[in-house]
Every structure is written in C-alpha cells, then in structure tokens.
Amino acid sequence: MAAKEVKFHDHARTRIVQGVNVLADAVKVTLAPRAVMCLIERSFGAPVITKDGVSVAKEIELQDKFENMGAQMVKQVASKTADIAGDGTTTATVLAQAIVQEGMKHVVAGVNPMDLKRGIDKAVATVVDELHKLSKPITTNKEIAQVGSISANSDHPIGKIIADAMDKVGKEGVITVEDGKSLDNELDVVEGMQFDRGYLSPYFINNPEKQTVEFDDPLILLYDKKISSIRDLLPTLENVAKAGKPLLIIAEDLEGEALATLVVNSMRGILKVAAVKAPGFGDRRKAMLEDIAILTGATVISEETGKQLEKASLEDLGRAKRVELQKENTIIIDGAGEQKAIEARVKAIQAQIDESTSDYDREKLQERVAKLSGGVAVIKVGAATEVEMKEKKDRVDDALHATRAAVEEGIVPGGGVALLRARSRIVNLKGDNGDQDAGIRIVLRAIEAPLRAIAANAGDEPSVVINKVLAGSGNFGYNAATGEYADLVETGVVDPTKVTRTALQNAASVASLILTTDASIAELPKEEKAAVPAMPDMGY
C-alpha cells in the first residue's frame, strides 16, 4: 500500500478550501447574461468554448491532492444539481463557495462545526419553504419561452423553439436535441415513444459525453421472457451482423452469459448492440411490448404465439429511424410501423379507458395512448462551426431542463432576487444556541453571492446592486442583460423554483461536510528516481 499524507484541523480545511475557490472562481465567470466565456483545451481537436458551468467544473483536476479533494466535492454540487434540476449548476457552485468561505471564518474562531451545520440546515429549510411561497405556476407558452431564454443566457430564439416543442408534444412530451445541418435552429416532430427503462450495462454506451447509447436505423428484437443463454440469440445475431445494422434487444431481462457476450461484442466493435428491460410488469408488460411492436413493425417473440427465440428471422425484427438509451429511459424515434395499425391500437386502448373502473389503470392506459400518439420533438441546433455547435447544444440542453423544472414547481424572480426575498424569513430566525445562530448568519450572508457574481460579471458594483434590490420589494430586481432595475417577472427574468431550491440545498449539503471535516488523507506523491547520467565524451 502506498504511503499516505494526513492533515488535521485548519491545515486540512485550508487546503480543501483553496481547491473549492479555484473551481468556483473558474465556474463563476459563466454566471449571468453578460458573463464571459471559458475556453477549455482538448487533447485533440479544437478547444471548447462554453458558458455552461457544469462543463467547466467537469474539466478541473488539481495537482495538489488536498486542493483537488475540495474541488471534487464542489464538482459534486454542480453535477447533482444538473442531474436533479438540469440547470443552476453555476448558482449552486457560487453558493457552496460562499457558505464555505463564511463558515471557515467561524470555524477558525472556535465555533462548534456541528452546531454551525445545524444552524445552516435550519436556515436553508426556512428559505426553501419561503421559495415555495414565492413560486408562481407556469401556464402560458410565453412564460415557458421566457424560462428557456434566461437559462440559455438570454438567447430568445432558443426559448421560443423549446416553447414550440412543448406546445406540439405536451409539457410531459419527449424532446431531444440533435446537431442540425444548417445555420438556423429547426424543430421536427416525429412519431416516437419513450419508456422508463435504461441500458442494462454502461459498457453499451457509445456516446461517452452524453452517457447514452445512440443507434441510427437499428433493428429491434422484442422478447417476452428472460434471456440467459447466448445460444438462443446466436442465429439472430448472425443475421443482424450480415445485415450490417445495429441491434436493440428489449426483453424481460438479460443476464449471465448472454449479457456478457453482448457486452464483449459491443466493446470490440464486432456488433453494434444494446439491451434494455421491457417496460411494465406482468400483463401490462406484454401489452407495452405489443405497443412497441406495432410502433416499429416488429413481431413479439413469445412462446404463447408459438414463436421461439432461436428461430426468429429478420422479418420478425422491428425498425426505427433512431433509438437513444439513457441511464433510466429509452427513446424510439420514427418507428417503421404502419400508421393504420398504430391508429387502430390507439382506438383499442381508448376503448379500454372508457370501460376501466380503476383510476390507476385508466392513468396507465392514458400513458400508453400518449406514448403511441404523442410523438417526439427533435430540436436541431444550427451553427457555423463545430465549436459553436457544441456550446449552443449545451445551452439548449440546459434551457430544456430548466423549462421542465419550471413546469414542475413553478417560477420565481430570477437574477438571484428570489433568494434575497426569501432571506427576510431568516433575519429574525434563532437557533438553539449561539453557534447555531452563527450558522444562520452564514446562510443570510451567502445567499447574496449569486446576485453579487451576476452584478460583477455585468461590470457593476455588487454592493450597490444588492442595496438597491433590497430597497425594493416583490419582483423588483436587477436585470443584468440591460443593466436596469424593473419587475423581473414582467420583463421575463425568471428562474424555475426547482432550480433555485436544488442549488441552495446541494450547496449547503456539501459546504457543511467541508466545514465539519477535521482530517484529510491523501496519497503521497511518488518520488521519481533520478535518471542515470549520460556517459561523458571519452574523446574518441
């Protein structure tokens, strides 16, 4: 085992905080509509230019082991916020840095870190409760467009195209983002289906950047039983390999030898293949497999209908223009099934809805109708260069997640103002002792940080902006895009409540862990042996 270096108390925390500051300062420059870009070197190809906070955070690895631990902990804040809310990563990072910096002052002064944490938790819970009270439901197409625009760094065309997509496939509909072939953004609505099952093994992933499996023009095998032996699958795999197409297997389960063989073939590039579990359970699973079969023009391989897996032919396999497998979802786009068959299936399910007496069954049947008839909206992002395309796609993804979060929990005034307004609830909040009161004061000060960063990036004096906003009330705040003060909801500067809430909760969680850390352990750097000196010239 390699030797370890151990640091205690302030020596441990100080180095960790230095790492937090390096990452947060790099991410902070991307906050606000007038923020600057961050340029990221790539080991090959052109550098990436981005205003996406989580993209910046993911690139940071520090040489000092203790500083790197601090950076990685704050990176978790950004990643978790992105996973839950889809946006707010920069806000979460800025809040985490502010809580850590304010908290360190108290820890160094001898305040009990555990009571400090309890005070922070109490203040955060109160602020979150107030955010829910400030929240306003989002209903109109215009409001959806406003949320999307703000999240995409005030890019109004992006906000509009997302609002149009939601209008066409519904607020709960499936919307995907792809590279476009022109300079302009385009919106296509294609027949498609999404179900809540993801890839069975991460080794199937062929797009490591998005952590997804993506196949164009695949064949689709549907089987209603468990597959354990590769022998049953071999004839189908050989036929698919000859056809030169990717294969998606949807079955009750895949395990053991069968799954291992598919993974090895996929990793070696012998066959483009991936597998997912069939959606639903019991009779509902069979019905949903039949839905997928009708959508893709496949035949479900089932012993009940006399079909055996080892005798499946290419004619039994379904087809689609594209499939995308995520960790927890699968999307089938533009299946090759006949429109008449799909319409007949929808009518049959609607008849079942009319006859159903169970609210639960009716809800599940309605979900199936939506999956068959709703379609998938595809936003094709246009750009002049590959570098611009990557940056723009990141912003469209952020904006899409933000609008979904807004639909879910509503909106609050943007630009860091909602946190300032919610702060009023904790001004007079008291803890069980003085150390907990110090934790409450940390949050009171830290939730100014996002607005301070926004003002600084826009070239204004943060303290002046904070005081002017606090002098107003309600939705009155600072619009960084114009440099003016106005009703932010009326001018379209809004944030999803879920994004603001999640950013604060995740920031407080990780910052509290850093403040209560009293020892850090890291591997000692390996000593490089000196190279053997070259032989001197012997004069020959």
Curated annotation (Swiss-Prot):
It is found in: Cytoplasm. CDD domains: GroEL (cd03344). This is Chaperonin GroEL. Pfam families: Cpn60_TCP1. It comes from Methylovorus sp. (strain SS1 / DSM 11726). It is an enzyme of class 5 (isomerase). HAMAP family: CH60. NCBIfam families: GroEL (TIGR02348), PRK00013.1 (NF000592), PRK12849.1 (NF009487), PRK12850.1 (NF009488), PRK12851.1 (NF009489). The keyword Transport does not apply. InterPro entries: Chaperonin_Cpn60_CS (IPR018370), Cpn60/GroEL (IPR001844), Cpn60/GroEL/TCP-1 (IPR002423), GroEL-like_apical_dom_sf (IPR027409), GROEL-like_equatorial_sf (IPR027413), TCP-1-like_intermed_sf (IPR027410). The gene is groEL. GO terms for cellular component: cytoplasm. Belongs to the chaperonin (HSP60) family. GO terms for molecular function: ATP binding; ATP-dependent protein folding chaperone; isomerase activity; unfolded protein binding. One of its GO terms (biological process) is protein refolding. ATP binds at residues 30-33, 51, 87-91, 415, 479-481, 495. Disulfide bonds: none annotated.
